[in-house]
UniProtKB/Swiss-Prot annotation:
GO terms for molecular function: RNA binding; ubiquitin protein ligase activity; ubiquitin-protein transferase activity; zinc ion binding. SMART domains: BBOX, RING. The lineage of its organism: Eukaryota, Metazoa, Chordata, Craniata, Vertebrata. E3 ubiquitin-protein ligase that plays a key role in innate antiviral immunity by mediating ubiquitination of CGAS and STING1. In response to pathogen- and host-derived double-stranded DNA (dsDNA), targets STING1 to 'Lys-63'-linked ubiquitination, thereby promoting its homodimerization, a step required for the production of type I interferon IFN-beta. Also mediate monoubiquitination of CGAS, thereby promoting CGAS oligomerization and subsequent activation. The modification Phosphothreonine is found at T418, T442. Residues 371-484 are annotated as: Disordered. Its EC number is 2.3.2.27. This is E3 ubiquitin-protein ligase TRIM56.
Length: 755
């Protein structure tokens, strides 16, 4: 980049897009300069003129159109001079390959001159060798500079040609501009000087430039000073935004961990209370059964004695009654003396007592506080840290701790720990985790960036300028899954990096991602027609060559080969770019999704609503329609992936659903519920446990589904830095790679609830 104090070279002005119109993207024709100093073609400005005003396409400044039209905008003689130089270098007889002499037709009267070998920089004429030898032999031309034509067209004399080049008057062709009218500030030729400006004070151009250059240079120096201040302010603003995003990511992780800890504690309390309730009911039931057995025995004895006495009194004769009177009376008196109805045992009825804070809407377990961040000094030594270091640590120490009997209590780590190490300790049903166990679950064990003790963390540079948007939407709280068996996987930010490389001519448009080798990803950049390799840490590893003219769309890595779709064709190439085979696909859809099977020896591609599977030799192994023939014409799989369990997962834009099917096309599950927020389902990826990660580009989300296709909740949102996510892939079954529309890639580690 050219610094403010240096002057741009003529070669840069001629070779760059400086002479191209930013509207029609062609070389400028009749260039006109707006007051904002942006130059466009006169015809292009006429098309933009609306209601007597023109809005600059670059700076968006609106300027009024002069009453005479856009032709009255100031003519850019500087650009005209550069254009004349470019046209002069490119002119010539294209059929003969060499330009013709401009003087021979005038001297000899022929229609065409001889081949030109030289050029006069003052006359701007091409000359043959004979005319060039005598060109400087006259009083008017003895100071002219004649140079070799080959060197001139190669650009060797551009600087000298510019010095000798005279600007032409637009009103009088052939006349050079020589004067400046001081009252009118208008450039004049000799003819213009004699007409309306005859009585006006005029200066020669060289003298006028010497008089006015110091004022312009002073204004330029003032603007350069403003630019320095603006750059410094922009740098400070970017650093503040990076610190904000870094702190937001840190606080978001803390919120998720705190919410997860509270949920774990609540679930543990639920199990504990339900266990106490079951034990109480079982003990009460056992005691009640014993009492019931005793009462039933007494009842049977009394009922039998009463029945016997009743039969004797009803059916016995006098002698028989009197003979048994003593025995019956004794037994009945004995039974009457026993406690027939003992008082019931005390029965303690369970009652649930809820903490008042659970029902209090004003009780906030999580609360944010906002503090004005102080400017950060670059030369900080040990203990300086980032904005969110000691200050956020002190805030965490001042926060009230959530306590319960035998439950969870979030703890603050020491000041030297990074946010990823400052995990909120939680307890499972059998007890509390130790700090060492919690540290073992951080991404450091997987090769992530290690924290810098006491100094500025490395990851600030990774955050800086990466995440483009932070939504005001609250961070999603992942709850228990549908069967109630624990929590969902949650994301842990790993790294972020851009995919635009120095050799790219255009901004990347990532249309495909796939894992490639150990801890690498392969990126299909359709805009730059490249398959780029990156490590999980964002290191650029080069490219996999593709056939000339191919724009890779979707990509999948197989055993020692790469499959990708491009322009209704399926290609299989080796890592060196050699084409193994290609297959023509249906033209009925704009793009074809490609996915590798778990075995790595076959590739699946979506074609007009069905799935075709090819082996390494290019033979069609199988073909099926999700849902069978009954679904013919009813499917449109735009995104496709496979699961470690051997299932196919696709985003069906015709049914607006996510469909899961086996290798025979039998539908295992399908989701088309309100969790899609009315969006078309986007890219899909599957982790090692079968969880499905679905991208919803319109709402900046990645949601998670269970292996059967039931929606579980949000996994990533705009809070995590997502801005129009495009495609995703899963690496090693635990790293979710997400590409954004601006070419940036975010990587999140998928942390399972039982880890």
């Amino acid at each position: 980049m050219v610094s403010h104090g240096s002057s741009p070279s003529l070669l840069e002005a001629l070779s760059s897009d400086f002479l191209a119109c930013k509207i029609c993207l062609e070389q400028l024709r009749a260039p006109k300069t707006l007051p904002c100093l942006h130059t466009y073609c006169q015809d292009c400005l006429a098309q933009l003129a609306d209601g007597g005003r023109v809005r600059c396409p670059e700076c968006r400044e609106t300027v009024p159109v002069p009453p005479e039209g856009v032709a009255s905008f100031k003519t850019n003689f500087f650009v005209n001079g550069l254009l004349d130089l470019v046209k002069a270098r490119a002119c010539g007889d294209l059929r003969a390959g060499k330009p013709a002499c401009a003087l021979c037709p005038l001297v000899g009267g022929t229609s065409t001159g001889g081949p030109a070998t030289a050029r006069c920089l003052d006359c701007a004429d091409d000359l043959c060798q004979a005319c060039a030898d005598g060109h400087r032999c006259t009083r008017q031309t003895h100071t002219h500079r004649v140079v070799d034509l080959v060197g001139y067209r190669a650009g060797w004399y551009d600087e000298e040609a510019r010095e000798r080049q005279a600007a032409q008057c637009p009103q009088h062709p052939g006349e050079a501009l020589r004067f400046l009218c001081q009252p009118c500030s208008q450039l004049l030729c000799r003819e213009c000087r004699l007409d309306p400006h005859l009585d006006h004070p005029c200066l020669p151009l060289a003298e006028a430039v010497r008089a006015r250059r110091p004022g312009l240079e002073g204004l330029l120096a003032g603007v350069d000073n403003n630019l320095v201040e603006l750059e410094a302010a922009r740098r400070v603003e970017k650093e503040a935004l990076a610190r904000l995003r870094e702190q937001a990511a840190r606080v978001g992780t803390q919120v998720e961990e705190a919410a997860e800890g509270v949920l774990r504690a609540l679930l543990a309390q639920k199990q504990e209370v339900l266990g106490q309730l079951r034990a109480h009911v079982e003990a009460a039931e056992e005691a009640a059964r014993e009492r019931l057995a005793e009462l039933e025995g007494r009842e049977q004895v009394a009922r039998a004695a009463a029945a016997f006495a009743r039969r004797v009194l009803s059916l016995g004769r006098e002698a028989e009654i009197l003979s048994l009177e003593g025995a019956i009376a004794q037994r009945l008196r004995q039974l009457q003396g026993c406690p027939w109805a003992p008082g019931p045992a005390p029965c303690l009825l369970p009652q649930l007592e809820l903490h008042p804070g659970l029902l209090d809407k004003n009780c906030h377990l999580l609360r944010l506080s906002f503090e004005e961040q102080q400017p950060q000094k670059d030369g900080g030594k040990d203990g300086a840290g980032t904005q969110g270091g000691e200050e956020s640590q002190s805030r965490r120490e001042d926060e009230p701790k959530t306590e319960r009997q035998g439950g969870v209590q979030p703890q603050a780590g020491d000041g030297a720990q990074t946010p990823k190490e400052e995990k909120a300790q939680t307890t499972r049903e059998e007890g509390a985790q130790t700090l060492e166990e919690d540290r073992a679950q951080t991404p450091h064990e997987d090769g992530g960036p290690q924290p810098h003790r006491g100094g500025r963390p490395n990851k600030k540079k990774k955050f800086k300028g990466r995440l483009k948007s932070i939504s005001r939407e609250p961070s999603p709280a992942l709850g228990p899954n549908l069967d109630g068996s624990g929590l969902l996987p949650r994301p842990i930010f790993y790294c972020s990096f851009p995919t635009r490389m120095p050799g790219d001519k255009r901004s990347p448009r990532i249309t495909g991602l796939c894992p490639f080798g150990p801890r690498e990803i392969l990126v299909a950049d359709e805009q730059n027609r490249a398959l780029k390799r990156f490590s999980l840490n964002g290191d650029y590893k080069g490219t996999v060559p593709v056939p000339e003219g191919c724009s890779p769309c979707s990509v999948a890595a197989l055993q020692s080969a790469v499959a990708f779709s491009a322009s209704a064709r399926l290609y299989l190439i080796n890592p060196n770019g050699e084409v193994q085979w290609r297959r023509a696909l249906s033209l009925s859809q704009a793009s074809h999704a490609v996915a590798a099977l778990p075995s790595g020896d076959r590739v699946a591609v979506s074609v007009a609503g069905h799935v075709e599977v090819y082996n390494m030799e290019g033979s069609l192994a199988t073909r099926f329609i999700p849902g069978g023939k009954a679904s013919r014409g009813l499917r449109a799989l735009v995104f496709l992936t496979t699961s470690p369990q051997g299932h196919f997962v696709g985003s069906d834009w015709q049914q607006n659903s996510v469909v899961i099917c086996d290798g025979l096309g039998q539908v295992v599950g399908e989701y088309k519920g309100p969790g899609l927020h009315g969006c078309q389902p986007g890219s899909v990826s599957v982790d090692k446990k079968g969880y499905i990660f679905l991208t919803l580009r319109e709402v900046n989300k990645v949601v998670i589904l269970d292996p059967k296709g039931s929606l579980l909740g949000d996994f990533l949102t705009a809070y995590h830095g997502l801005e129009k996510p495009r495609v995703t892939t899963m690496v090693d079954g635990r790293y979710l790679v997400v590409s954004l529309s601006n070419g940036t890639i975010h990587i999140f580690r998928v942390r399972s609830p039982d880890s």
